[in-house]
Structure formats: structure tokens, C-alpha cells
UniProtKB/Swiss-Prot annotation:
<keyword id="KW-0378">Hydrolase</keyword>
<feature type="site" description="Stabilizes the basic form of H active site to accept a proton">
    <location>
        <position position="95"/>
    </location>
</feature>
<dbReference type="GO" id="GO:0072344">
    <property type="term" value="P:rescue of stalled ribosome"/>
</dbReference>
<feature type="site" description="Discriminates between blocked and unblocked aminoacyl-tRNA">
    <location>
        <position position="12"/>
    </location>
</feature>
<dbReference type="GO" id="GO:0000049">
    <property type="term" value="F:tRNA binding"/>
</dbReference>
<comment type="function">
    <text>Catalyzes the release of premature peptidyl moieties from peptidyl-tRNA molecules trapped in stalled 50S ribosomal subunits, and thus maintains levels of free tRNAs and 50S ribosomes.</text>
</comment>
<comment type="function">
    <text>Hydrolyzes ribosome-free peptidyl-tRNAs (with 1 or more amino acids incorporated), which drop off the ribosome during protein synthesis, or as a result of ribosome stalling.</text>
</comment>
<dbReference type="InterPro" id="IPR018171">
    <property type="entry name" value="Pept_tRNA_hydro_CS"/>
</dbReference>
<feature type="active site" description="Proton acceptor">
    <location>
        <position position="22"/>
    </location>
</feature>
<keyword id="KW-0694">RNA-binding</keyword>
<protein>
    <recommendedName>
        <fullName>Peptidyl-tRNA hydrolase</fullName>
        <ecNumber>3.1.1.29</ecNumber>
    </recommendedName>
</protein>
<dbReference type="GO" id="GO:0005737">
    <property type="term" value="C:cytoplasm"/>
</dbReference>
<dbReference type="GO" id="GO:0004045">
    <property type="term" value="F:peptidyl-tRNA hydrolase activity"/>
</dbReference>
<keyword id="KW-0820">tRNA-binding</keyword>
<feature type="binding site">
    <location>
        <position position="70"/>
    </location>
    <ligand>
        <name>tRNA</name>
    </ligand>
</feature>
<feature type="binding site">
    <location>
        <position position="68"/>
    </location>
    <ligand>
        <name>tRNA</name>
    </ligand>
</feature>
<feature type="binding site">
    <location>
        <position position="17"/>
    </location>
    <ligand>
        <name>tRNA</name>
    </ligand>
</feature>
Length: 192
């Protein structure tokens, strides 16, 4: 039987953040839960919203932390431990300033590029050797700080494309689970 995968969409809890750029990981996780035919419930040991099922033929634990982005590791670490999932079988879905809006990139290991949610996860897992589905949100215009940009809703130019991008990020996540990092990168990175 295939080993389980922990897939975590990063974001901030609360309705005031639901449509912000930083919450694209939550948006993708919601699509994946729909594809699995499952709903999220609070996991007592970790405090995260969790559902279990199968994606791409593998058992999956799908989660959305219920703490602020910068503290995500507080719930991801206990989930990985509870389900006995190795860091290399953890997939984090997150927003990425350094990638143009709408582009999706897959990565395994490496630095966190100033993303405090990833830093928190790496600290909790004692390694950065987890996999990532990086959903491009682009850089802020002008002199606007990245910190304020990620907490803003998608603008009127971006919103019409958002549904397609979220579906593609969910597709990319399933390919990563099914094929592994390099074959999935070859496919996903050719999309744009």
C-alpha cells in the first residue's frame, strides 16, 4: 500500500482573509477536498482543519491550519507526527511573490525565500525537505510592501482568472502526488 501524503494549504483563518492572496493555499485545499468528496473537520490533536481520503491513487491527509500563516508549523508538525508522515511526503500549497500571477511551480526542499509560513513549517519538521506547490501571485506594484500586498484581495484584473488558476494548482498537486517531483515538474512547468 502506498504511503500517505500530508497536503497542507497555507492561509490565514477568518472571513476577513478568505479572499486574500495569502489564502490561495486554502482555496486550493478546498478544491482538493471537493474532488475527494470530503469535508474538513477540526483535528483534536493538532487543531487544524483536516480531512482524509485519496488523491491520485494515494491516501491523503488534507489540512488547513487554523493559526496565522506565520505559525503554520505549530499545526503541521503535530499532524505529520500523528499520521507518521515523513517530511518528504509533506506537500505545502502556498502563495509565491517571486512567481508571476497565475504561474504554478513545483519544488522539493530548498530555501523559503522569506515566506514565514514555510519557515514555520520547516522549523516544525526540523527540515525544509518538504515539497511545495508554489502558486504565483506576482510582485506588488510600485513601492507597496509584499507584507501588505499578500493581505489584499485579488484585484478586478486577477479575479476572472482565479478559478482556473486554483483548479490548475489542484491539478498540479495531484500530479505531484501521482508522479513524484521531477515528472510532475516537467508537466506543470510546461503549462506556462
Amino acid at each position: 500500500m502506498a504511503e500517505p501524503v500530508l497536503v497542507v494549504g497555507l492561509g490565514n483563518p477568518g472571513p476577513q482573509y478568505a479572499t486574500t492572496r495569502h489564502n490561495i493555499g486554502f482555496m486550493v485545499a478546498d478544491v482538493l477536498a471537493d474532488r475527494m468528496g470530503e469535508t474538513f473537520k477540526v483535528h483534536k490533536k493538532s487543531g487544524a482543519e483536516v480531512t482524509t481520503g485519496r488523491l491520485a491513487g494515494r491516501p491523503v491527509v488534507l489540512a488547513k491550519p487554523r493559526v496565522y500563516m506565520n505559525e503554520s508549523g505549530r499545526q503541521v508538525g503535530p499532524l505529520a507526527k500523528f499520521y507518521s508522515i515523513a517530511p518528504t511526503d509533506v506537500v505545502i500549497i502556498h502563495d509565491e511573490l517571486d512567481i508571476d500571477f497565475g504561474r504554478i511551480r513545483l519544488k522539493a526542499g530548498g530555501g523559503v525565500a522569506g515566506h514565514n509560513g514555510l519557515r514555520s513549517v520547516g522549523s516544525a519538521l526540523s527540515t525544509n525537505d518538504f515539497q511545495r506547490v508554489r502558486v504565483g501571485i506576482g510582485r506588488p506594484p510600485g513601492q507597496k510592501s509584499g507584507a501588505s500586498f499578500v493581505l489584499e484581495p485579488f484585484n478586478s484584473r486577477e479575479r476572472p482568472e482565479l478559478g482556473t488558476i486554483i483548479e490548475q494548482a489542484a491539478d498540479a498537486t495531484e500530479l505531484l502526488i501521482e508522479l513524484g517531483i521531477e515528472p510532475a515538474q516537467n508537466t506543470v512547468h510546461a503549462w506556462s
